[in-house]
């Protein structure tokens, strides 16, 4: 019998997840389909009960439900609990277990796409929202030397560092981070600044950027933000958000099926869809 997977969120119609997952199911000969489930904010509990009742094998969870699903699950793994958000649920015979593959997917994409190890690296993360949380806690599980946080409201960055690792992390205002740019090997934008349709704005001035540094942006629409274009012009190696999108999906796929999908194929499909 064909297994059912899907995405729970609101809205979901623009998601590229069905494209990635259904192609991977077909290529690996797995009898399964991935669907979109639009779930309004008041209906999260009912939707999760539906996953149980209908025997849906697994779901991804997107905005605005990553926090709201947690009370309805039987178990939440430690990494997801620490982040305070779930993006992947597995249905083990009616027992629902929540995971978070966002930050882990980001870190794996960064290492594989840039062909680096994070050991000993000094990293600056811009932003302190949901995306930043997942990435920050995932970076803490690597051997990076420093993971510093910069945010418009410094208090949010401070809270994150206090929850994380105050020995390896400091927190700054954006203005202070701009003066310290030369200290870092990797600079990551986790905010939506520069995303379509407001493509003219940039999260941080790159005036003091050293050539050869990696500049990474989790935005994938546009594929190359104005900020990444400038970083490239200043001699940086750049990475867009397609890798994170694909690898968080691939990690969820692996949790559901026990098989690792063709991530290069997934990337190609996503880029083609974004260019349409």
Swiss-Prot record:
Q: In which pathway does it act?
A: Metabolic intermediate biosynthesis; chorismate biosynthesis; chorismate from D-erythrose 4-phosphate and phosphoenolpyruvate: step 4/7
Q: Which residues form the active site?
A: 66 (proton acceptor)
Q: Key word Transferase present in the record?
A: no
* Cellular component, GO annotation: cytosol
Q: Which UniProt keywords apply?
A: Amino-acid biosynthesis, Aromatic amino acid biosynthesis, NADP, Oxidoreductase
Enzyme kind, highest EC tier: oxidoreductase
Q: Which reaction does this enzyme catalyse, per its entry? A: shikimate + NADP(+) = 3-dehydroshikimate + NADPH + H(+)
Entry protein name? Shikimate dehydrogenase (NADP(+))
What is the scientific name of the source organism? Geobacillus kaustophilus (strain HTA426)
